């Protein structure tokens, strides 16, 4: 974990403790989960994205989850076992079905660390029946959050929350537009840090930070001279230095098409109802939960060509249930047919060394030069 990330976590601990003193309920959410934070915010709660990895948290997680479980899930459980000052303030854990890792991790956290769990289930298809199911599921989720919060969520409170989150999405979209038009002023690591602000400090702090960053871009220009790459696949939580290693090798990550990327927020919630929320989250194109949608690979190659990138780096956390070998094979075939330079990286927190990744990145750089 970098010095900046360490300081962010320290500051987040202080904020969460202050919120607890104000009788705010803290809801832990697996960082990659498709959980409508709007409902938690509307209920007066604070959604905290569980996004910490690194240290010996993954190995500690083996006490609860098999070593063949993805190391992000194991790291999350390991943080609880290590009595993380941030995570020990959590009042409820949102238990979703984003992936097998989330299912297992949230079950262990609730059972062994005695934290209330609130269930939410998402479909994996984009059909009319899936939308109907999700609308009903979000209504159940809303009722469960209301019961835990001790009061109902009014229509006005939900509308206010949706508009606030849409404001953040508009700011992110504006930033992406400036990045594209001006030649990518911010590095991939800097863009990643913007999302970490949201994960740790919440929607209001994220909005203020984005406004400051946008103002700071005025009059700035890109440094240039680096090979531009598209980053896709698994997200990069706090403590994962993969994008830092990529950029240290002379690349510039111009698009991060994961749940830790700005392009994840390319659309808005159109309306102020549960139905509007369901449509938004079901159609999240860059969500790993929807990785098997037919448009994913077509969309990836289209973005590559439109951005004039030099290559694609596809990142997979080892044992991730969302990226089986069939995905790797299909992706490799698609990119080979298009003659697109491509590197697939697989990593396990606590096991894969930086030196191993640096060697592969250097070879890829030589290929695209």
Where is each model-derived feature located?
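Peripheral docking tails and interdomain loops at the edges
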Residues: 328-369
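Glycine-rich, highly charged phosphate/nucleotide-binding loops
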Residues: 66-84, 289-302
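Redox- and metal-dependent alpha/beta enzyme cores, enriched for Fe-S-associated oxidoreductases
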Residues: 33-34, 38-53, 60, 232-303
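Metallocofactor- and cofactor-centric catalytic cores in central/energy metabolism, strongly enriched
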Residues: 10-20, 28-30, 36-38, 57-62, ...
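C-terminal hydrophobic structural anchor segments
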Residues: 293-338
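A charged, amphipathic alpha-helical module
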Residues: 2-27, 139, 143-268, 282, ...
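Acidic/His-rich segments in extracytoplasmic proteins that coordinate ligands and/or metal ions
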Residues: 75-147
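Gly/Ser/Thr-rich loops at beta-strand to alpha-helix junctions
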Residues: 29-37, 96-102, 232-239, 318-326, ...
């Amino acid at each position: 974990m970098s010095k900046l990330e360490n300081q962010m976590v320290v500051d987040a601990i202080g904020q969460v403790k202050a919120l607890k003193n104000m009788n705010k309920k803290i809801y832990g959410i697996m960082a990659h989960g498709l959980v409508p934070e709007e409902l938690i915010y509307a209920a007066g709660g604070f959604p905290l994205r569980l996004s910490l990895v690194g240290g010996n948290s993954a190995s500690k997680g083996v006490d609860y989850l098999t070593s063949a479980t993805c190391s992000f899930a194991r790291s999350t459980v390991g943080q609880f076992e290590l009595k993380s000052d941030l995570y020990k303030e959590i009042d409820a854990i949102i238990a979703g079905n984003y992936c097998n890792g989330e299912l297992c991790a949230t079950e262990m956290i609730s059972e062994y660390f005695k934290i209330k769990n609130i269930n939410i289930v998402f479909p994996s298809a984009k059909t009319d029946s899936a939308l109907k199911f999700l609308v009903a599921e979000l209504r159940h989720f809303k009722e469960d959050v209301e019961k835990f919060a001790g009061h109902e969520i009014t229509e006005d409170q939900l509308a206010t929350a949706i508009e606030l989150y849409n404001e953040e999405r508009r700011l992110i979209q504006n930033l992406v537009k400036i990045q594209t038009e001006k030649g990518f002023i911010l590095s991939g690591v800097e863009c990643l840090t913007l999302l970490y602000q949201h994960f740790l400090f919440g929607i209001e702090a994220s909005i203020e930070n984005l406004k400051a960053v946008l103002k700071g871009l005025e009059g700035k220009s890109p440094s240039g001279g680096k090979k531009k790459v598209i980053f896709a696949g698994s997200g990069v939580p706090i403590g994962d230095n993969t994008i830092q290693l990529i950029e240290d090798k002379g690349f510039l990550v111009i698009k991060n098409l994961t749940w830790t990327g700005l392009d994840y927020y390319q659309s808005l919630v159109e309306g102020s109802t549960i139905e509007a929320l369901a449509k938004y989250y079901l159609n999240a194109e860059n969500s790993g939960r929807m990785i098997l949608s037919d448009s994913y690979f077509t969309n990836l190659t289209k973005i590559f060509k439109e951005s004039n990138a030099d290559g694609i780096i596809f990142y997979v956390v080892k044992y991730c249930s969302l990226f089986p070998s069939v995905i790797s094979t299909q992706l490799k075939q698609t990119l080979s047919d298009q003659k697109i330079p491509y590197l697939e990286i697989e990593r396990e927190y606590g096991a894969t060394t930086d030196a191993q990744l640096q060697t592969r990145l250097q070879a890829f750089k030589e290929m695209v030069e």
